[in-house]
């Protein structure tokens, strides 16, 4: 099921938040939903020249007659325009469409290499410019992994390279656990308009796992304090298994130190019982002192 459903909708209120935040009477639901659709459509039409720089559009309504629109982008200057001209025009356009007061805010993406939508947009833009899709996918994959992604999967489909029969091509690196609900997976989709038709680009980006109960203040925060439970390990015995692993690692490190110092088996056994890390030279010096 995780392979088919949208990763964002599957994790809403687990480690993702709603993109449209409002609550009204059910009689107004269809009207408000259609307004949200029009807002996103008109903004993308107006900013079609820089549509590949838009990561997301969030809509917040605390008042039936006031709408707050948050445009998420890695390049705020191109969206704002000269002295805020673009924001002013967008506000006037949306006010005519839905006849409500519009407030527009800009939210900057600090790390675009770890934003799935920006990655998908970048790939689509380069494919439109006739860059080799294999080269583009491998370049995007390596860049995101170097910037700290724990896993990335990119799938591109359509008439690749002008082929007569449409096909898909996929690259993957690291872990992308789509079935794990606590996994913080970012998803992006974009389309490239080519002379051969539309080529679709999908990106799944794994940022880590969210453990424990989340609050509004730390929603989406990645916590990696403990190693994760492996398949086949029960939750009941997980702490016991962790303790056993720590003891085993301690024994291995102690054995490596003893081997480096050149201690015999008897000396190693004695040191393990005492829980000490004396070197062979110190033991020899003690024996000489006792003999003298």
UniProtKB/Swiss-Prot annotation:
Alphabetical keyword list: Ribonucleoprotein, Ribosomal protein, RNA-binding, rRNA-binding
Listed PROSITE patterns: KH_TYPE_2, RIBOSOMAL_S3
Annotated stretches, region: Disordered: 247-268
KH type-2 domain ranges (all copies): 39-110
A GO molecular-function annotation: rRNA binding
GO cellular component annotations of the record: cytosolic small ribosomal subunit
Annotated GO biological process: translation
Entry-linked Pfam families: KH_2 (PF07650), Ribosomal_S3_C (PF00189)
Organism superkingdom: Bacteria
SUPFAM superfamilies, alphabetized: Prokaryotic type KH domain (KH-domain type II) (SSF54814), Ribosomal protein S3 C-terminal domain (SSF54821)
PANTHER family found in the cross-reference section: 30S/40S RIBOSOMAL PROTEIN S3 (PTHR11760), SMALL RIBOSOMAL SUBUNIT PROTEIN US3C (PTHR11760:SF19)
Subunit structure: Part of the 30S ribosomal subunit. Forms a tight complex with proteins S10 and S14.
Function summary: Binds the lower part of the 30S subunit head. Binds mRNA in the 70S ribosome, positioning it for translation.
Family from the record: Belongs to the universal ribosomal protein uS3 family.
Protein name as annotated: Small ribosomal subunit protein uS3
Originating species: Borrelia garinii subsp. bavariensis (strain ATCC BAA-2496 / DSM 23469 / PBi)
Gene assigned in the entry: rpsC
């Amino acid at each position: 099921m995780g392979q088919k459903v949208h990763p964002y909708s599957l994790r809403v209120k687990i480690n993702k938040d709603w993109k449209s935040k409002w609550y009204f009477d059910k009689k107004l639901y269809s009207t408000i939903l259609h307004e949200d659709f029009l807002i996103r459509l008109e903004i993308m039409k107006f900013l079609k020249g820089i549509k590949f720089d838009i990561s997301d559009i969030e809509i917040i309504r605390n008042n039936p007659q006031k709408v707050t629109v948050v445009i998420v982008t890695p390049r705020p200057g191109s969206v704002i325009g000269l002295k805020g001209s673009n924001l002013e025009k967008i506000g006037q356009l949306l006010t005519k469409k839905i006849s409500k007061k519009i407030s527009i805010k800009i939210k900057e993406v600090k790390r675009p290499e770890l934003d799935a939508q920006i990655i998908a947009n970048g790939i689509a833009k380069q494919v439109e410019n006739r860059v080799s899709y294999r080269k583009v996918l491998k370049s995007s994959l390596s860049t995101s992994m170097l910037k700290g992604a724990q896993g990335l999967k990119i799938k591109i489909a359509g008439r690749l390279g002008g082929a007569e029969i449409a096909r898909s091509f996929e690259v993957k690196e690291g872990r992308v656990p789509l079935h794990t609900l606590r996994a913080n997976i970012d998803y992006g989709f974009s389309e490239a308009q080519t002379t051969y038709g539309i080529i679709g680009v999908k990106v799944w980006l794994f940022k880590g796992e969210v453990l424990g109960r989340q609050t509004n203040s730390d929603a989406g925060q990645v916590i990696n304090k403990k190693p994760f439970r492996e398949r086949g390990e029960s939750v009941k015995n997980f702490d016991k298994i962790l303790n056993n692993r720590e003891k085993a690692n301690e024994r291995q490190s102690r054995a490596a130190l003893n081997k480096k110092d050149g201690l015999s088996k008897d000396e190693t056994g004695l040191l393990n019982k005492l829980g000490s890390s004396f070197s062979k030279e110190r033991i020899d010096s003690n024996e000489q002192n006792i003999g003298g």
